[in-house]
Structures are given as C-alpha cells and as structure tokens.
A protein has these predicted regions:
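Basic/aromatic-rich interaction segments and small domains that mediate binding to polyanionic partners
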Residues: 3-50
Length: 53
C-alpha cells in the first residue's frame, strides 16, 4: 500500500514523494518530483523506495 510521504521511483528512475491521493481514481496518487514538478501517476508505475511509517 502506498501512503502519503513514501519516497517513490518511476520507470525512468525519477525520484519523488507521494503528496496526496487523487480525487478521481483510487489507483492514482499525486507525486512531487525532485525535479520540481508534480503530477498524478498510476500506482503500478511506481516503486516504493522508502516507506514512511
């Protein structure tokens, strides 16, 4: 289960932090990328690197 605050990586190797859940779909999350932008991403395209408990 992906939670807010988890450090994630996408298929391209970009790192980001989950900042909130999408209002439209329960399988999408908002990610704040280290490059500075943010967008929604389907959870199947993300790998959790560090889980915040």
């Amino acid at each position: 289960m992906m939670k807010i605050g988890n450090l994630v990586r996408d298929a391209y190797g970009s790192l980001g932090v989950i900042i909130k859940y999408s209002e439209r779909s329960n399988r999408h999350v908002w990610v704040q990328w280290c490059a500075g932008d943010s967008c929604t991403v389907h959870v199947r395209n993300l790998e959790v690197i560090d889980e915040r408990r």
